[in-house]
């Protein structure tokens, strides 16, 4: 049976990795992705609403997104929201859809994105290590209070370290995958 402390640590580490993965999906890579628009909201009858809840977003060709709102009166609001965002893209509105064309990124832009990816992944690693630190601190406290033996403490510390190594490795794989995606031409 797995110790409850280890279960909780693993769950927290897994959630940290998942959060980093989600954050990386939103990072621009030069390749169009509907996830880039998830954070952009428009005013929909007085309520800030994500674009993906009022329109269909499709990837077309190699470097463009087509945003087709369910109500045509939202076209200009979507266009303005994208222009106001930090995506650095210029939407075109043809009366039916909003088209986002992604220009080929320069090598400098790609390097900047890789650097940003590395920062995001590093935050994930720090989170995983902080979880390890908290668990080890808790184990030492339990040993001090006589709840577990020193042998159990050492065994559990080793297992926590193994979990940490596993999730750090997962984060490294996420980075490598994203870096490869960014550097593709």
From Swiss-Prot:
SUPFAM superfamilies: Ribosome recycling factor, RRF
UniProt entry keywords in alphabetical sequence: Cytoplasm, Protein biosynthesis
Transmembrane feature ranges: none
Subcellular location: Cytoplasm
GO biological process: translational termination
A Pfam short name: RRF
Protein name stated in the entry: Ribosome-recycling factor
UniProt organism field: Thermosipho africanus (strain TCF52B)
